[in-house]
């Protein structure tokens, strides 16, 4: 009897090896979302942090999980994330914004830009713009200590929830280098930021003489109320005077450059 049982077992094993066992293989389980952390920042359309913004997962296994942005607009949200995870940023008084994570990264960071529900102040028009150097910049020659230009502010094409500017300032008729002949203006409500900056360098470069140039870089901001007419505000940045160009790429030797950085330069704007 014992030999018969052993033989029967052997026959069953052989049958399985010969493919007579028709049991279908089971598909591997779908990977579950990865437990991770997503960090980021929330700003308004003038790059001010928005404290108290609610950051919430709106789909997937952790739908409803949320956190609150701190006083710097920064947040950290832990949960189960995959490429389809949708995260919303909302706060009263602002138009909410949403991000889909897409392909996960090793250290994901999200950037939300929320527009106020109230429209931004309209500052379009023709102006006279003056840059005045800080009095603590004794090395700058008088010719570049104060520079005045006719200027025009025009609306820029932007989308809600983006980091794009609301306006652009140009200088018709002024001898500025191509690509360094404008700067952008960001607006949130009645708060205005003049971004006189191009890749952390001068946004405006004026040709003074055939081989001498004046450049200015910096940021200035203020609240203008219901309209922009006349303002005089601090400009944090640098005035730079190149006494003699050393190459076709506008390189200026250190001994031919006069530069002054300060938080107390002035930007003066008067409507014409």
What does each of the following model-derived ranges do?
Residues 18-29, 102-121:
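Extracellular beta-sheet/turn segments enriched in Thr/Pro/Gly and aliphatic residues
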Residues 86-102:
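A short, solvent-exposed loop/turn motif at the edges and junctions
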Residues 36-38, 44-60, 82, 139-143:
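Short, ordered, surface-exposed loop/turn motifs in non-cytosolic proteins
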Residues 131-235, 239-244:
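Predominantly extracellular/secreted and cell-surface proteins with exposed
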Residues 74-84:
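Short Pro-Gly-centered beta-turn/loop motif in secreted/extracellular proteins
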Residues 60-76:
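Short, acidic Ser/Thr/Gly-rich low-complexity loop/linker segments typical of extracellular
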Residues 36-44, 73, 112, 127-129:
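A short, amphipathic beta-strand motif
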Residues 232-272:
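Edge beta-strand at a domain terminus
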